[in-house]
Amino acid sequence: MQSSLIKILGVLAIVATLVCFVFAALGMIGAVSVGNGCYMRYAPGGKGGSDSITSTITLNANANYVNTSTMLPDGTMQLTPDPAHYGEWLNTQVEVKDKQAVSLQVVGQISLCLAYVPKDNLQFTESTRPGKSNLDDNGKMIPIPRVTDVNKPPLSLIMDAKNNEWRNITEMYANDRILVSVTPNYSPGAGGTVGAMDAFKGTNVTADCSQGKTAYDPICGRYSIYSGPYVNACELKQNYWQGNKKQKCPNGCVWGTIDWCYTAPSAWCTYYYVCDSLSAWVNNYGTMPEPYKDDGTFTFSWASNSGGIFIDYANLQCSNNINIPPNGKCPDSVDDRSPKDKDYIGGAGCTSGVCNGGEFQSQRRFWYTSDGNGGKGPTGLIWQISNTSNVDSTLPSTLQFAQFVTASDQPTEYGNEYKVIYNIPFNSNTDKGYLQYRLWCPTSQDASKNTGGYVMNIKQTKCYRENGNSLTDVFNNRGQVQYLVVPSAENPNTSGKNYSPEAAIVDSKGKANFNAAGEGYIWMRVLNDPNDYKDSEGSYKVHFSTSQSVGSFTIKVMNPLLQLFKGKVKGAAESIFRNIVCYGGDTSSCTNFFNYIKALLILYVMVYGAMFLLGFAKINQKDLVVRIVKIGIVSGLMNGNTFEFFNNYLFDTIANFSDEIISNMSGYSLFNSNGTVSNPFMFLDAVMSRILFSQTFMAQLLALLSLGLSGIIYFIITVIAVMIVIITAFRAAAVYIMAFMATCILIGIAPIFISFLLFDFTRYLFDNWVRFTIRYMIEPVVLMAGIIVLTQLFTIYLDFVLGYSVCWKCALPIKIPFIGTILPVALLNVPIFCINWFAPWGMDYMSGMMGVNMQNIVALVIIAYGMYGYVEFSGNMVARLTSAAGPSATSMGGAMSGAAEQGALSQVGMDEKTRKGITGRAKERLKQRNETLKQAEKTRKNAPKEEPPKAEIPK
């Protein structure tokens, strides 16, 4: 029992292993894709005689199509471009002929170079880091990630508020895509530290960004331009200054009146001033900036002008002229120390002491933050685009304050970590520009006392091109789609030849048209600086559409064959005729057959005259006329112009009789556009050219296999029908050739048979010569008459069966059988993978349905077999019509094509040997069956009859 179980398990293991191998093989087949090409049913404009081919290729920006595999630490394999294959041409697999029209559309976006941190950037300038402002600490240029690199963070540059000048964040060329963002204001709470990546050091730098401090690192995302003391309260000081001055006269004045002394001349009265001790609201000072608070107490909100983000604390005074200290004299140096901003600073309700309850206390602002304190953008950040990269501190008359983009334009991968402030493509008439930023600060102020700063982040897609359009930056026509037409056996990447590429001039939608300059395959690449291919990224989808002329069966096969054969046969027949009559040449090597005819003619007249004189022959009027006509015909053809007469009048008329009749029946002209004689097989050109030379037809035929098992049956039946038609066409050609050759030979030996007209006992030879000549002239006509009709029917039904456009795509999905018994119903009908194959345009591979009517396929086979049988039928028909028993062109043509015909039919089991074998075996089985039945009947008759049992008689 145990051994049986082990055997069963072993068998199951072997079966499981085989199944795994089968699925692995099918998986590899399913992964194969020869392209996205399609073969269209109809050519553009509905014209026939051409294959309308569409194809799609992927054109890499780096022009590298060779990958190398690298083992990663986790054990997985990573494919990377081979460094030795950048800038190579791609074979599109689109084959063209010279001057063939090709239409294409280039779709997609690519980046053909990498952006780097510019000189005089936000973090360093050439004055602070000579010759290395754009290099990291290792002396290397710092690349900027592309906008499309969603898995990479943007490059961060730290902008210090102490730098009161325009700095470059990037260098821009036409069509560049830029994404500038700012890191939000960090508020980690008390004692918290934050970090930012320093692109120059290549490390993460940290700083304490907790609230309650008056100085911060630039990575904290806040800055202040304020420093030093400022008025933060007003205090009433009694007896602060001497005011309200009065003149006082001392004792001994003339009149002794003080009041009068005020106005009395000094000559009359000596006086002095007396003042009152007055109070004043004096400034109480604090130090700017006030400690930063996370709740935004001392933070400006975003504004679109400098007036909204600046408070001039120097002009705030509790009293007029309070900034001028009292001199202690009467009167004081100023006579006005009345309250100025006391109510605003200290509050109107406060009348003594230190007052700090004014509206000013809630409106104090010292800090600018990158989140704008809830505003529309980073506060105080201004930008401009400059034509030069020079560092400059001059502010323009109109300032552009950075703003956050709308929520819909904010990349989802940025989240709340980065806030985008610039995403405008650079489309300028200038060759290049520099995007510059700075933190706003009054130009008259010493920026070195500022504190804090912002962290700016950038992504840039440089050398951006789309839809095959090219632009000139530092490299001419960068991004131009170029093509070559190279012979099929040649590879421009390895041939070592110098080529002159052509440019595909595209419109704004990427569409272009060109005529191929040569014959071969189209190779393409994107033009770029050779040094930038390795940094290029992206790819184009190039959609091709072209109409390729299908090779003509008439031009490629029949015309060369018939012209060569007919020329040789006709020349041989003329040579025979010429040699018989010794025409136009050296007569020393030939004997003029006309001399024999003359002798026979003289003998004929002499014998017939002697018989008439001796009374052995009776001559009536009819007999006399017939004999005179015979003598006239024979004697008339025995002059030196006989050959010209036959050659110029009779030979071509008789030899080309069949061609003219067949051409008239088929509706095709016997003459080409250049006036030369064509061949009578023009009616076969459309169907035979499609079968033998059309790529679309082959794809349509192979697409039948995408139907699975039923498709295999359809495919076999259709192939059989097509093979029969091909065999019939070549057999008809063989019949035509043999008939033409026989006709030419009979005409060539005409002088011999014409002489047989003289005597009654040789006249049957002349009659048979005429009969066979007519037979071989008519036989191709009768044959082609039926073939023409059947060919038209075959063409119609062939289009019914294969009338669809074909694409290379997923056609045969592979599913696990009985999956519903193991997995949930939701996983039913889900393919594991799919095998790519030719399939009709629009067919759903999940359903496998395609509109192929079995009736049309059966009709196709019937018509094809009817064409095959009609060849023999037409030969028998002509034999009856002409009453010419003997070899026919049909039998001779069948013998010529027999070997090839039987060999082709043997592949599908329809050759004569196989059919005779099937017929013989069927007859043998029928014979054995009849013998068995006869033997059974004989046995039954010879068997003794059993008598019924006799009834027992009771005793």
Curated annotation (Swiss-Prot):
Which Pfam family would be a valid example here?
TrbL
Q: Which UniProt keywords apply?
A: Cell membrane, Membrane, Signal, Transmembrane, Transmembrane helix
Highest taxon, organism lineage: Bacteria
Q: Which residues cross the membrane?
A: 597-617, 707-727, 739-759, 781-801, 818-838, 857-877
GO cellular component terms listed in the entry, alphabetical order: plasma membrane
Region Disordered, as annotated, extends over 127-146, 905-955
Q: Which cysteine pairs are joined by S-S bonds?
A: none
Biased region (Basic and acidic residues) positions are 910-955
This protein's membrane topology, according to the annotation, is: Multi-pass membrane protein
Question: Could you tell me what this protein is called?
Answer: Uncharacterized protein RBE_1263
Organism of origin: Rickettsia bellii (strain RML369-C)
Upper classification of the source organism reads: Bacteria, Pseudomonadati, Pseudomonadota, Alphaproteobacteria, Rickettsiales
